[in-house]
Amino acid sequence: MMKPFDTHAHIYDKRFDADREQVMEASFRELDYIVCPSENLESSQKTIELVKSYPRLYGAVGIHPHEACHATEDILASIADLAEHNHKIVAIGEIGLDYYYFYSDKETQQEWFHRQVALAKDMDLPVIIHDRDAHGDVVRILKEHKDTRLRGILHCFSGSLETALELIKLGFYISFAGPLVFPKSVHLKRVAKEIPLDKILIETDSPYLTPPPHRGERNTPLNVIYVAEEIAHIKGLSVEDVIFQTRANALGIYQIEE
């Protein structure tokens, strides 16, 4: 039977320092692939080292919107160099806009978002998008970059059905994480029901956003199964069908050959 693909897990996070190897061994007994996105140059370098250790772990490098205030030309050049010289780096990310915390101001966030989307296109890589309370500007900026090379993933989707459909038209996949499983996530469940399965990905965003029944605990890639089960329930499909299609979708967008 096909095993799930967790498209977004921060394996380098310090919360895994004490037992990372055990977590990865347990995860790869139940999952086929994991992608580890980065937040800044330091985590990008950690991701590079991690993907060397696990054959089915792939990575992404980039500057998170929280880190945009620390971004420089040299940092971006270093990230580009990491992506160019490591075949297991399959995307630029996670990048985007966060208007909830505002660790960086809007103008700075947007500047580095633009720069990294352009970088991804130059390198013919997909982008992994972080969008918190910034749906309008995220869609606007992506539309400004629209061409045949623009593609990617809207990670941990939290927007409306209309936003999801606009992103799909732009060549993006919609990725659902633990919040889809929360009983109160009525609008998210509607989005998952209405958009086609061939445009859906699943993720954990480990160690964050742990789904029921493990709320309050550290999240791990093993919990991606709960997201798959929720999509199956919402769409009236088998869990096997959801795992098969989301896995195929992830292999396609990340251009991973089996």
Residue ranges and their predicted role:
Residues 1-258:
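Mid-domain alpha/beta scaffold segments of enzyme catalytic cores
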